[in-house]
Swiss-Prot record:
Catalytic residues (positions): E196, H212, K300
Keyword Kinase: no
Catalytic activity field: alpha-D-glucose 6-phosphate = beta-D-fructose 6-phosphate; D-mannose 6-phosphate = D-fructose 6-phosphate
Pfam family, one: bact-PGI_C
Family: Belongs to the PGI/PMI family.
UniProt GO BP: carbohydrate derivative metabolic process; carbohydrate metabolic process
The protein's name: Bifunctional phosphoglucose/phosphomannose isomerase
PROSITE patterns membership: SIS
Domain of life: Archaea
Source species of the chain: Thermoplasma volcanium (strain ATCC 51530 / DSM 4299 / JCM 9571 / NBRC 15438 / GSS1)
Coiled-coil boundaries: none
Function per UniProt: Dual specificity isomerase that catalyzes the isomerization of both glucose-6-phosphate and mannose-6-phosphate to fructose-6-phosphate.
Keyword terms, alphabetized: Carbohydrate metabolism, Isomerase
Assembly notes: Homodimer.
Length: 304
């Protein structure tokens, strides 16, 4: 399947209705790396009823116990760090679940949701995220339908994304993505999509944290003209004011990205898909294969 075809699957992924059965728990721990791990990052920002802790390493926190819902996410099912963390969680009697397309993780005896194979992990964000949303948030049918509609529209018209990609390419810019709650993880997702799809370095941060660090170099950093600032528009007046003032006092020009949708679910997936198409178009302009992750695979083999 070509990457352009993978993009077209996201709208159907938001209708993936699988969920886990959970018992009494007082915390959630989600383990995942790379394209699989981003689902946990996004979920942790939109769910606040119980503490959510993310694991992107071999080891798990000491507080994991029998009141922990532990979700291991690995698209391939063979991610070394995630398998190690899952084994540790099981030893500590956590309620371990898994989201995977197969591999070793699917054979470990955990409560497992099997998702379709044949995609890049980062192109499976709906399959990886929706089981978490369905289990712990339980979205309204109308919210899912709205997300489906917006994604369908983006599939048909992504000229804005193509235009931004052209500006970045023609100026040989380094993308800098700024978000704010509840889209901080989406800003990071864009950063990683620039990395993997377009094969360019990128940087992400979020308001208002960046006003306590990034603000200083924004005005006078060297090679300032090489950066291209992409900022998610916020309907929170506190963040909106910070964005406006930051742009003004640092003398930068922010390329504002509107967030379409009325429900949070629709907004999240709209921004995800916007970034997917933007980085896909940049990959095309650069003449690189957005599906190629050969260096990452080579690294895995070297350290195995």
């Amino acid at each position: 399947m070509q990457f352009s075809e993978e993009l077209l699957t996201l709208k159907d992924q938001v209708r993936f209705d699988k969920s886990f059965k959970v018992g009494k728990y007082d915390k959630i721990v989600i383990a995942g790396m790379g394209g699989s791990g981003i689902a946990g990052r996004i979920f942790s920002e939109i769910y606040d009823e119980k503490p959510v802790f993310l694991v992107d390493d071999y080891d798990i926190p000491s507080f994991v116990d029998d009141k922990t819902e532990f979700i291991a996410i690995s698209y391939s099912g063979n991610t070394e760090e995630t398998i190690s963390a899952s084994e540790e969680a099981a030893k500590k009697h956590a309620n371990v679940h898994a989201i995977t397309s197969g591999g070793s993780l699917s054979k470990m005896g955990f409560d497992t949701i099997i998702i379709p194979s044949g995609l890049q992990p980062r192109s499976s964000i709906g399959y990886l995220l929706m089981p978490l949303v369905n289990t712990f948030i339980k979205p309204k049918i109308g919210d899912v339908d709205e997300a489906y509609r917006l994604l369908s529209e983006t599939d048909k018209d992504n000229e804005e994304e193509k235009s931004i990609a052209s500006e970045i390419y023609n100026g040989e810019h380094i993308p800098v993505i700024y978000g704010s709650r509840p889209f901080r993880a989406i800003a990071y997702r864009w950063k990683t999509q620039f990395n993997e799809n377009a094969k360019v370095l990128a940087y992400s941060n979020y308001f208002s944290e960046l006003n306590h660090n990034d603000t200083m170099p924004l005005k006078d950093t060297y090679r300032k003209d090489e950066f291209y600032f992409l900022v998610f528009r916020s309907d929170d007046s506190r963040f909106s004011k910070r964005i406006t003032v930051t742009e003004k006092i640092t003398g930068n020009s922010f390329r504002m990205v509107d967030v379409r949708g009325s429900s949070l679910l629709a907004k999240l997936f709209y921004l995800i898909h916007f970034g997917d198409y933007l980085t896909y178009h940049l990959a095309e302009l650069r003449g690189v294969d957005p599906q190629d992750v050969s260096l990452i695979e080579k690294l895995k083999k070297e350290i195995a």
